Amino acid sequence: MSLAVTEVTHNHPEGIKGAEATAVCVFLARQGKSKDEIKAHVSEHYYPLDFTLDEIRPTYDFDVPCQGSVPQALEAFFESTSFEDAIRNAISIGGDSDTIGAICGAVAEAFYGAPKEIRSKALTFLPQHLVDVLKRVETVFCQEQEGES
């Protein structure tokens, strides 16, 4: 199923691989898998995650291909302790920060939930029709998560 979803916006094999890895991480997080289990799956099927953020931070730069941003975004999640910490990790490495933050944030939200105040504020930036779409998707596909306090 993740291939069908990713092919809508990604038509290069590496792009599909990166989007699929992200979708699988979100799925596994929503299934209650641990970070270690999710990381092992990514390492086995998608990317070697044999680095830390501290190791790459001094030299990491903007890297457009998925293999230069998806593993880094996922590592930002794996090294986090909360939703907000995950986003801070993602931004801290530099590079394509909006992409890395979006990838990391998707997995972090599935794993931790988003704090209510962050979610509420973020929704104010969306047009109402997109808020309605989000609510319909969540009703069909997502268990409600309380989010962090």
Segments from the language model and where they lie:
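Small-residue-rich helix-loop
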Residues: 19-23, 30, 34-63
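Histidine (H) residue identity feature
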Residues: 10-12, 41, 45, 129
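Solvent-exposed loop and edge beta-strand segments that line ligand/cofactor-binding
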Residues: 10-15, 59-63, 96
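Compositionally biased, intrinsically disordered low-complexity regions
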Residues: 49-52, 115, 149
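Catalytic phosphate/nucleotide-handling subdomain of diverse soluble enzymes
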Residues: 2-10, 21-27, 68, 73-147
